[in-house]
Amino acid sequence: MKNRKILDYLTILFGFLGLGAMIYLLLSFTLNLISKNSCDIISSVINCTKVVTSNYSTLFGIDWYYYGIGFFSVIIVLSVIRLFNKKEKQNRLFAQLILALSIFGAGVACYLIYVELFLVHHICILCTTGHIAIFSLLIISILRFTKFKDTI
């Protein structure tokens, strides 16, 4: 039970890390409440503005960070429900959903990393924060089903 709660808290923590990065992008590039250059580092490679304003920054006309906000919000909600829910069958289902979402999210993150490195030729630090959060969620989910399978 203790291991399960620790994994749930870690899932919530990384969910908020990713959500925070996506909201920062929203505030910077859509709502213009934060300077767009605030996450650009004087470098030929690290430049959020070039990544977020590139031709690859949307899917079906929607900026990728909106999908990130939705993704991390769902992960957080499922994890909070798991944390307070006492029904094992439902908790197992929520854990499976989080694992499935994490696998999907990791696949999308791999695609976006490819886009940043090989198509745009720039890296966005905030996007990278989101990618790290997604891969951390995947590792936590895998641990939940392997090492701590008795505490799902």
What positions do the PLM features span?
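Membrane-interfacial helix-loop segments of redox and metal-homeostasis proteins
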Residues: M1-I152
